[in-house]
Amino acid sequence: MFDQLGVESGLVSSAPDEGTFRLRAVLGEARVIPMLSPYRNGTDVFSWARDGSIVPYVESIYRQGTHRGFGEFHLNAGQSGLPVVRTLLAFAQRENLFLQPHADARAMAELLPLVTDQTVLWAHAGVTATPDQVEALLAKWPKLWVELSLRDDVAPGGKLDARWGALFAKYPDKFMVGTDTWTVGGTYTGNERWDAYPDLVRGIRTWLAQLPTELAANIAHRNAERFLAQLPR
């Protein structure tokens, strides 16, 4: 599928972690960039920040030099100071792992002052964060980058939103595309997101085509390549 769609690589995490490496064995090391997830199963998404057993789990599965970042991890406002969260943030810093938080603008505003020396890739551009909120954090935190999966509001109905377009132009080196093919139970019990993957990619390319060529190339792949290249090994 990646070959057919021209997708070169992606950040991948699994619950449990072994799924990432099964996929990597099939697609190759260059295609699958492993992320260190704090989740053993779907329920950990909601409880990990207060579950002390997550710390030894993360430490036990960590593959030094192979996992490139810590995340995606869900973080609510008021949770950045919790002991489990602080312990794993410190672990990520010691191991030179970038952070990939799934957090709204308020939670990010609490997190970023605690991790000023760490590179942060903001998952889903804050999920519900407005362009103004994203801009405010980018202006303040130079080590913050932004990933755009699940943000249908970037191009409602396929037409690029003017506010997002202006923000991309102001920060041409900070944004990158994403798709997010999660499976969480309930409605999503199988391969629904993977089945929709070609449509997701085509939708992204539709709004990228509405940007200037160089800016579109940055968001499509160049920024992600630069992001990975500047990470410590």
Describe the role of every protein-language-model region.
Residues 2, 10, 34, 70, ...:
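Divalent metal-coordination and catalytic microenvironments
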Residues 1-9, 13-14, 18, 173, ...:
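Mid-to-C-terminal alpha-helical segments outside catalytic/metal-binding sites
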Residues 17-100, 145, 150-154:
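Active-site gating/metal-coordination segments in enzymes
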Residues 1, 20-23, 54-61, 84-88, ...:
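A general structural detector for well-ordered alpha-helical segments in enzyme core domains, enriched
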Residues 36, 82-186:
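Catalytic pocket-lining loop regions of alpha/beta-barrel enzymes
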Residues 42-50, 155-160, 186-196:
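Short, flexible/disordered intra-domain loops and linkers
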Residues 30-33, 141-145, 185, 191-205:
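Active-site gating loops and adjacent loop-to-helix segments of metal-dependent hydrolytic enzymes
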Residues 15, 75, 125-126, 224:
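Flexible loop residues that form catalytic
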